[in-house]
Amino acid sequence: GYDAAFHFTSHTFSPCGIRGNFGPTLAEQVTYYKRITPSIPWDQTSILDIGTLDGSVSAHGFQKFTIPKDGLYQIDAYGAIGGDGDYYIHSLPGKGARVRANFTLLRGDKIIMIVGHQGPPSHASNGASGGGGGTYVLKNQATTSPDDIYLIAGGGTGMAEYGAVWY
């Protein structure tokens, strides 16, 4: 059944190896999570979904998770690290923030996750890399109310250009 299929006590949601402006599709999520946690039948249940937020807002790249049973859930959200560079190692990208909180959730509740990606690298000898993406954990609502936000963790800064480290 539903509870038996999801007997894990912890799971890490990630960008599923996808980089760029868009998050993973549902097929990419299923493939990635089946490789990471093969004992879970990710493709045989409605636990993981993309679909839409309340049927109105397209959710491509969002990860929607259905809570398998009532309980207290600890959620850690990490912002992504900033991009690095190809030419110099005089500066390092910033690490993303980490935010942790506990929430009482009920079986069937849905949470939406937008998992930040590492910032793009600098491919120029005098350029800076991009900042890392933020990670958001939200209630399954198509509103902008602060009450619909569980956690937000900011992404890290990109690596400074070569000359910036000497000032």
Residue locations for each model-derived region?
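Short, solvent-exposed loop/turn elements at domain surfaces
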Residues: 20-24, 83-86, 160-163
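Extracellular and analogous surface-interaction loops
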Residues: 5, 49, 54-57, 62-73, ...
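Extended, low-complexity, turn-rich repeat/linker tracts enriched in Gly/Pro/Ser/Thr and Asp/Glu
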Residues: 81-85, 119-122
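Aromatic- and Gly/Pro-rich amphipathic surface segment
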Residues: 35-47
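Extracellular beta-rich ligand/substrate-recognition surface
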Residues: 44-59, 88-95
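Secretome/extracellular-domain signature
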Residues: 93-167
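A short beta-strand element within beta-rich, extracytoplasmic domains
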Residues: 71-81
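Boundary/junction segments of secreted and surface-exposed precursor proteins
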Residues: 2-36
